[in-house]
Amino acid sequence: MTQSLCKKGGLGRGLASLIPTGPVDADSGPATYGPQMGNTAADVLIGGSAQKDNAMGAVYREIALSDITENPCQPRQVFDDEAMSELVHSIREFGLLQPIVVRPASGSCGDTRYQIVMGERRWRAAQQAGLSFIPAIVRATGDDSMLRDALLENIHRVQLNPLEEAAAYQQLLDEFEVTHDELASRIGRSRPLITNMIRLLKLPIPVQRRVAAGVLSAGHARALLSLEANPEVQEELASRIIAEGLSVRATEEAVKLANHEVNRVNREVITPVPQRRKPICMPGLQDVAERLSNAFDTRVMVSLGKRKGKIVVEFSSVDDLQRIVDVMTTYKT
C-alpha cells in the first residue's frame, strides 16, 4: 500500500516539475508545456496556427472531478466495459499515469469549470476508481478544434469502433470542407482507408448497430456494401453471418452468389421473352393441308404469316423421305 502511495506521489511531483502549476502571471507571459506550435495538438496535423493575442499555453493542475464536464464533440460513443474495468483497476493500484487535457469553461454560476479535450475514458475511470481530483493539463482550445483533438487521440489509440471513426471522418469533411485526400494527409491516414470507412455509413441502420457493437467486423461490413440488393437482403445476410459465424472470405463468396442471382433475375425481367406470332387463319388452308396429307400419305401443315407462307411435310425415316420425293416427282411429271 505504501509503495502504491509513493508511486502516486512521485508521479504527481514529476509532472509538476515539468509543467507549471497554479495561476499564470499575465505580465510574465503564459507558462507553457513544451514548445508552442499552436493552440491544439491537432494544429500540427490539421494545419492550424496559433494567434499570438489569444495563445494561452498549457498549465498543469490537480482538478476536482466534479468541476470537469464531458467533451460534446467526443466521437467515441461506446466505452468497452472490460477495458474500462482494467483501467479502473490500474488507477486504483498505480494512480493515473497520464493527465487528461481540458479547456476552461464557465459554469452556470460563473464558477470556473473545465471541459475535456482529451482523456474522457481516463476521467470516467477515475470517477469509478473513487478519485476526487485528477491531474490535468489546462489548455486553451477553440470549438473548431475539439472534434479534431478528440478524433486524433482516439484513432491513434485505436479506441474508436468502425462506425464512430467513420462518423468522425464524415464530420471533419463536412465541417472543414476538405477532400478525402486532404483529410488523409492531415491526420496521417490513407485516403482509401478514410473512403472505405465512410462508406460504412451507407449500411442499413440495424447493420450499423451490429458493427458498432463489435458483432460484425469492418471487413464483414465492407463485404455487405458490395451486395447489389435492397437493404432487407443486407440485413438478412448480416444475421446469417452472426448465426453461422461466417468469415469475411465466406461472406464475400456469399455476396458474389447473391449478386449473380440478382443479375440473373434482372436480365429475365429486362429482356422480354419474344412472343410467337399466331398464324393467320384463312379459309381453305386446312383443306389444302388435308389434300396434301392424303397425296403424300403423311402429315402436312400449311401456315400463312404476315409476309410469307410455309408448308411442313413430315417423314419418319430416310426411306419415307425418298418415297415422298418420288410422289412429288410423279406429280411434277
Curated annotation (Swiss-Prot):
One of its GO terms (molecular function) is DNA binding. GO terms for cellular component: chromosome. The keyword DNA-binding applies. The keyword Disulfide bond does not apply. GO terms for biological process: chromosome segregation; positive regulation of sporulation resulting in formation of a cellular spore. It comes from the Bacteria. Gene3D superfamilies: 1.10.10.2830, 3.90.1530.30. SMART domains: ParB. Keywords: Chromosome partition, DNA-binding. Involved in chromosome partition. Localize to both poles of the predivisional cell following completion of DNA replication. Binds to the DNA origin of replication. Belongs to the ParB family. This is Probable chromosome-partitioning protein ParB. The gene is parB.
